Amino acid sequence: MTGWLGRRALRTIHEFRTRLARYHLQHARAAKAALAADPLVETAVLRHAQEHSLTHADVRRRVEQYVDEIVPQLNILSYYKIGYTLAKIVLNLLYRVTVDYQDEAALERIPKRDVVVYAMNHRSNVDYVVVAYVLAYGAHVSYAVGEWARVWPLEYVFKSFGSYFIRRGFREPLYHTVLEQYVRLITKNGVTQGFFPEGRLSRDGRLGPPKLGLLDYVCRTVLDPAFDRDIWFVPVAINFDRVLEDRALIRELVDERDRPRRLAQLWTVATYVGSNAVRLVTGRLKRYGRAAVNFGTPISLKQWLASAPGVLDLPKERRLPELEKLAALLMERIGAIVPVTPVPLAAAALLSFEQTVIPKAAVLERMEQLRDRLGNVNAKVVRGGTRIPEVWDRAWRMLRMRRLVVEEGDGLIVLPRGRPLLEFYANSIAHLLPIRGPRVPFHKTHETETDLPTLKREKPR
């Protein structure tokens, strides 16, 4: 790094005390050249050309397209001076951000030279921003980002933040060879990464089954004889009192064709930020409750492989079922630390009665019972020592603002349009609650005036 911008970038790294791989300080041209010249990529090029009767030059051009699409160029000033500042403003306009650790000492014991990979549940497109924001002082995270963000200006923004794009559901072997070699390249160079094992946003609020592609790519880096580090997977659980895209996700669960366009999703977030900015100026700011992040106990890949020797040497059809055990362990660890914020707790309590009109006193009593049960399984209840009436008041502000529940006398009425959203939020903690209500589709029938149907369990993809 030379010149004024280079010196400013180095000062920023020291200011944030960030964990940044030297690999990120080189120009993207070097990474692209290394990836294009990879022997395994060349082998895949020859195979693809032969199988599809294409010239070597034609396939090479396709590889160059994939490389340009995948490889980012981190701009440190963009990430920290622009990205961090905007994240701080946006998140504080929308939420109260809470961070907790299951074993902070274990995270601090990870050797500095080892590779850290954050594995997160996927609740909202805001997940990227929340986790990057809370980790900014100490670590830069390179995300695997879906094709939804490949639209101007998001594509440029994410690439300047050091994130790389992946085509979900794209099965071409040539593409996956390029992607795998890129993931192995950044892992070998110690880049801190973040990915979502579920591979997509949760449409019904529940934790989804893990996908194995990126996990396999990261793990197989250890097969390189020159790679002498350990890889640590850190479980990260995220939850919100309000997911900005919740209604769109529910509709998409019912009909995949009802998925909003990329610009529509961006416009939704921008609308919420803009409206809250106006409220801030006019003194009427109404945040959307909590955005909570919990970090779990890290898992050492070396230790896991010691109990499953030779797994990574197996052919793919035998290797992936074994790696599924590691993925299941990650999801179990993530599920155990999902933050219990006021709205999911209140939603679970309301729906556990399976009726429309419920005495408020009974709801508060049920919330107390549920919180006790959550405590018994060591669940991460946000501000667990707060009195239940105060927890209800925080949840009630959101439920009333969104017209999900109304109060009449000493009773609470669950509105027809509110029930699917209550299910969506209760589902986020359903795996922690051994009670009848939030573990199954809550209501077999619905009032006819609702425009959102009862949530059915999302099918694995």
What are these regions (language model features)?
Residues 1-461:
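Membrane-interfacial terminal anchoring regions of lipid-handling membrane enzymes
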